Design a protein with these regions (language model features):
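A solvent-exposed, acidic/Ser-Thr-rich amphipathic alpha-helical stretch
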Residues: 22, 28-74, 79
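Hydrophobic pocket/interface hotspot
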Residues: 11, 23, 31, 55, ...
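Short, low-complexity N-terminal intrinsically disordered segments enriched in polar/charged residues
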Residues: 1-25, 29
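A structural signal for well-ordered alpha-helical segments within the folded catalytic domains
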Residues: 2-5, 53, 93
């Protein structure tokens, strides 16, 4: 099992650095990624993504529309399959990202939940 403290710290740091390639390195090539923002950002064309390549423009767009995007880790929970990161953004909104990890410590399934 991937060390959750190290994973969470690296994941948050890469998001805060706005380094899309480093962010994507946390995800498997064939990741399945669900977020309520998927439909909003793709004008209803996608409700989830099924690869790292599909995530690249989605993450880039997030930094384009939110140039001051910043996450603060609040907590994490773990089990044998993966972990959940609970974090807050620069606006004060809280998110929980549920992540199933493969044996390489990469996210193979993610689901993001937001408080607003």
């Amino acid at each position: 099992m991937t060390d959750p403290t190290s994973f969470a710290a690296a994941w948050i740091a890469d998001w805060n650095a706005h380094d899309v390639e480093k962010i994507l390195s946390h995800y498997a090539e064939d990741v399945v990624f669900h977020s309520p923002n998927s439909a909003l950002r793709t004008k209803g064309e996608k409700t989830f993504f099924t690869s790292r390549e599909e995530l690249r423009p989605y993450f880039n767009f997030a930094f384009h529309i939110r140039p001051h995007l910043r996450f603060t880790l609040l907590n994490f929970c773990q089990d044998r399959q993966g972990l959940a990161l609970i974090y807050q953004d620069e606006t004060g909104a809280t998110a929980t990202e549920l992540m199933d990890l493969n044996q390489l410590g990469q996210v193979v399934f993610a689901r993001v939940l937001y408080d607003r």
